[in-house]
Amino acid sequence: MLLIPAIDLKDGQCVRLKQGDMDQATVFSEDPAAMARHWVNQGARRLHLVDLNGAFVGKPRNEAAIKAIIAEVGDEIPVQLGGGIRDLNTIERWLDDGLSYVIIGTAAVKNPGFLKDACAAFGGHIIVGLDAKDGKVATDGWSKLTGHEVADLARKYEDYGVESIIYTDIGRDGMLQGINIDATVKLARSMSIPVIASGGLSNMADIDQLCAVEGEGVEGVICGRAIYSGDLNFAAAQAHADKLGAE
């Protein structure tokens, strides 16, 4: 089980939001590259970056911070980025800059043709981010709820060659209420694309539950507020997951 620290970027700083609300941002570091180094030193094997400003305006914003992170750790572990990625030129530029994966969210829902083109052009590098509340997909930085069922949409992406799907339960994100295991497993079982869980990870019990369903197609989990607030020790959690995985 891959535990993936999240570095959410707003105005060049590393922050955490509550339920995607830009007005409820807690700044954890003014040096995102140093934060990236910290998580790698703690045993992270991949990093998850979110360009929050980019997600809201639909084009890259925090470019200096992202490039600094890639320069700091990009040669050591894969780095993935979501937020504001809505055209092929942006994908190409980020991959050329050293990102391993780009995450397409809103654009994958609104423009499946774009997702198909992206997978064809950059196979193996495209992750889809599906954000949902009560099983329904949300877009535009979670500000709009669609009528799409998560599983229906995800199954359509199987033929495209999507690398994995990050499934976020937005009702739980940043609230430390525990991962929605049932919804995550249900999605993973419904298709062949591996799922990365997100939203609400809070303690070792969540890690135990996730490791128990790894065989169902849940390959990782995004770690956010819990590893910043101290509720979860990242190094201990990854070591624990590795131990469970070896049993």
Swiss-Prot record:
GO biological process terms held by the UniProt record: L-histidine biosynthetic process; L-tryptophan biosynthetic process
UniProt cross-references to CDD domains, sorted A to Z: HisA (cd04732)
Which residues are responsible for catalysis?
Answer: 8, 131
Classification via Gene3D superfamilies: Aldolase class I (3.20.20.70)
Q: What is the uppermost EC class here?
A: isomerase
Which Gene Ontology cellular component terms are annotated? cytoplasm
GO molecular function annotations of the record: 1-(5-phosphoribosyl)-5-[(5-phosphoribosylamino)methylideneamino]imidazole-4-carboxamide isomerase activity
Where in the cell does this protein reside?
Answer: Cytoplasm
Quote the SUPFAM superfamilies the UniProt record gives: Ribulose-phoshate binding barrel (SSF51366)
Lipoprotein: is it a keyword of this entry?
no
Keywords (A to Z) from UniProt: Amino-acid biosynthesis, Cytoplasm, Histidine biosynthesis, Isomerase
Return the PANTHER family for the record. 1-(5-PHOSPHORIBOSYL)-5-[(5-PHOSPHORIBOSYLAMINO)METHYLIDENEAMINO] IMIDAZOLE-4-CARBOXAMIDE ISOMERASE
Family, similarity comment: Belongs to the HisA/HisF family.
Q: What is this protein called?
A: 1-(5-phosphoribosyl)-5-[(5-phosphoribosylamino)methylideneamino] imidazole-4-carboxamide isomerase
